[in-house]
Amino acid sequence: MDKFTVHSGLVAPLDRENVDTDAIIPKQFLKSIKRTGFGPNLFDEWRYKDVGEPGMDNSKRPLNPDFVLNQPRYQGASILLARRNFGCGSSREHAPWALSQYGFRAVIAPSFADIFFNNCYKNGLLPVVLSEQQIDHLFNETNAFNGYKLTIDLDKQVVLTPSGQGYEFDIAPFRKYCMLNGFDDIGLTLRHADKIKSYEAERVAKMPWLNNRVVG
């Protein structure tokens, strides 16, 4: 996955509490065995006026002009500003996939559902927890100013506003290490590839019968 060090991006405000994973990526789009192609159906039931199904040409579907991601001022947003309990509901990993594939690098909220929170880290999407008061201030700023951008410095663990105000956030050291270096579970395992190969070779030498193929 991509490294996350410092990111500056346009903010899109999603002013709803308890946004669940079925709203983030509806269940009918979970049939694919691939991990790609979910971005166009992010918040599908809110972005479009019709009912979406896999295989539809989204470019021909009627958009909901009132939904935040369809408004011109938020096109190209890479930081999602949300309310409490974001990502509640089922544990589908497709939810952070859809957010990342749409173009979001981070979600800032006062609280997240636990499983969604963990899935974000495993897929390179940074979940940032700030206080309710700080979130309220950011919503006010984002709504008041076109082109409102934030900078997230993961190494320093701070969110910087255009005025230079900084909001510090917490992150577990191991998760921070993985995000800074772009390590998902597979990447962490591959760091030990030489040791794994050495162990496998040693095992074959000591217990060759384990490699015998049983037929019948």
Swiss-Prot record:
The gene is leuD. One of its GO terms (cellular component) is 3-isopropylmalate dehydratase complex. This is 3-isopropylmalate dehydratase small subunit. Its EC number is 4.2.1.33. Signal peptide: none annotated. It comes from Cupriavidus pinatubonensis (strain JMP 134 / LMG 1197). Pfam families: Aconitase_C (PF00694). Belongs to the LeuD family. LeuD type 1 subfamily. Keywords: Amino-acid biosynthesis, Branched-chain amino acid biosynthesis, Leucine biosynthesis, Lyase. GO terms for molecular function: 3-isopropylmalate dehydratase activity. It catalyses: (2R,3S)-3-isopropylmalate = (2S)-2-isopropylmalate. It is an enzyme of class 4 (lyase). GO terms for biological process: L-leucine biosynthetic process. Disulfide bonds: none annotated. Heterodimer of LeuC and LeuD. PANTHER family: 3-ISOPROPYLMALATE DEHYDRATASE SMALL SUBUNIT, 3-ISOPROPYLMALATE DEHYDRATASE SMALL SUBUNIT 2-RELATED-RELATED.
